[in-house]
Amino acid sequence: MAGKKRIEDYGIIIGELPKGRLNKISDVKGVRVGHYTIDTEENKTGVTVILPTEGNIYANKFVAASFVLNGYGKTAGLVQIDELGTLESIIALTNTLNVGVVHDAVVEYTIEKCRRENINIASFNPIVAECNDSYLNNIQNRAVKKEHVFKAIEDAVEDFEEGDVGAGKGMSCHDLKGGIGSASRIVSLDGRDYTVGVLVLSNHGFMKDLTISGKNIGRDLAEKLENHNTVDKGSIISVIATDIPLTSRQLRRAIKRAAVGLARVGSHLGHGSGDIMIGFSTANIIKHDEPQDIISIRAMNEDKMDMVFRAVAECEEEAILNSMITANKVTGYQ
């Protein structure tokens, strides 16, 4: 989105793979992102939604996987993803104490969408992930409401904002402002270009550890600035999308490489950090009402996975930096 400079606009190039058109998760065809931001004296928070497809994700599910690097988190929906290897819901991000109401809103939205298509829902697995924004936001107010989720869904676009928007409004990263960031990479396989995209909700890390393009700049910053934390209490949610044909097992292997990008920026995955990766591939569709007993799933040659691993790592690193560099100053409620 025009107006905000991203990390590459400052001459900092992350990695070596080519980037997508927008250099965002939405470079994966069909993916859109929407925000609703709450910015009052008491509350600096919101909700961000990732729509995996322009169609009905419940009726036509995608192959999916999750990985918990450090489990100090309250993300809803990972158990079924791990068991079945499919995604049947939009993905919503919010603050820790608003997971319940956002979960309810995603259920209501999906029921209504399916009702219009004469699809009956008896079981459904919403995906709602969170980070704790209580440093800047009076989190006990639980300011996010169902109508905010619906508005974020309605406003979802390809070229979405980053920084202190939506769920990222009250987030902090390396003791500086964090929030929503994204990046994408192009991978060539069998002469065809595929896309890997990442969106992060960054809320983690110490200032002294902040590293950009291999250079530790955080140590000098920490010496000059006061009020930085000594305990890593934050989290990061990483959503990884691709159009590469992957099985759930292969996708899980790939999304683990987000940890490489995290480490490159200086995260040490502290005790109080919830580091959650959620991934999906748009290449294989699993029909909700599939009549066949046996279905075919396309998969990638295992020996060629290294480029996918590299793409995820590069996207994660750049997405975190974009989440910080695009964020505006936010004054908390305290």
Where do the language-model regions lie?
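Alpha/propeptide regions of enzymes that mature by internal proteolysis
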Residues: 1-334
